[in-house]
Swiss-Prot record:
It is an enzyme of class 2 (transferase). Disulfide bonds: none annotated. The lineage of its organism: Bacteria, Pseudomonadati, Thermodesulfobacteriota, Desulfuromonadia, Geobacterales. InterPro entries: Aldolase_TIM, TAL/FSA, Transaldolase_3B, Transaldolase_3B/F6P_aldolase, Transaldolase_AS, TSA/FSA_arc/bac. Its main location: cytoplasm. It comes from the Bacteria. This is Probable transaldolase. One of its GO terms (molecular function) is aldehyde-lyase activity. It is found in: Cytoplasm. Keywords: Cytoplasm, Pentose shunt, Schiff base, Transferase. The active site is at K83.
């Protein structure tokens, strides 16, 4: 399984990269806004840190505008992936960009059928949002399992990026289901490495070491 980091915070990306955990990065307008920096400046800096797919989202709502923005964004770096909304216009843009060899990530997916449409349009990646579904008492991980089954049934090559991850259990279940990628907030990445028994074991080893004659 690949791990992407879901942030536009360059410091977090650097820290996660030093751990050897980052295979790619996903950003969105909300994350860019939090950084307080210019969009292209942030994307350029990220591409200098991580040698992997970097998802940059378009703002236009019409297919023509999306394609125009995409052509501008891919000039930044070869690793740029165009993030498009799951709408009819987004599907049109996905089809056009895929035909030109431009990688796409269809986002804001909340049903298996939306993922299927994105795959049929030629999306490189599909991004179902599990946390937001959980928030409204729907089964977020359930749709990941359904998407995996549909893609396997028909041989779709679009990779499943599990997004809106809130906790380590989301990552665990994604791995068990066979999702291709999890895009994970930095805080959750750090949680993956933690367990109270690990901390207790380290403490015990250090205490015992102090008893060893020096």
């Amino acid at each position: 399984m690949k791990f992407f980091i879901d942030t536009a915070d360059v410091h977090e990306i650097r820290e996660a990269h030093t751990l050897g955990l980052v295979d790619g990065v996903t950003t969105n307008p909300s994350l860019i806004a939090k950084s307080g920096r210019k969009f292209k400046d942030v994307i350029k800096e990220i591409t200098a840190i991580v040698d992997g797919p970097i998802s940059a989202e378009v703002i236009a709502l019409d297919a023509e505008g999306m394609v125009k923005e995409a052509k501008d964004l891919v000039k930044i770096h070869k690793n740029i992936v165009i993030k498009l909304p799951m709408t009819p216009e987004g599907l049109k843009a996905t089809k056009q960009l895929s035909a030109k060899g431009i990688k796409t990530n269809v986002t804001l997916i909340f049903t298996p059928m939306q993922a299927l449409l994105a795959a049929k349009a030629g999306a490189t990646y599909v991004s179902p949002f599990v946390g937001r579904l959980d928030d409204i008492s729907q089964d977020g991980m359930g749709i990941i399992e359904e998407i995996r089954t549909i893609f396997d049934n028909y041989g779709y090559t679009s990779e499943i990026i599990v997004a809106s991850i809130r906790n380590p259990i989301h990552v665990l279940n994604s791995a068990l289901i066979g999702a291709d990628i999890c895009t994970i907030p930095y805080s959750v990445m750090l949680q993956l490495s933690k367990h109270p028994l690990t901390d207790a074991g380290i403490k015990k080893f250090l205490e015992d070491w102090e008893k060893v004659p020096k």
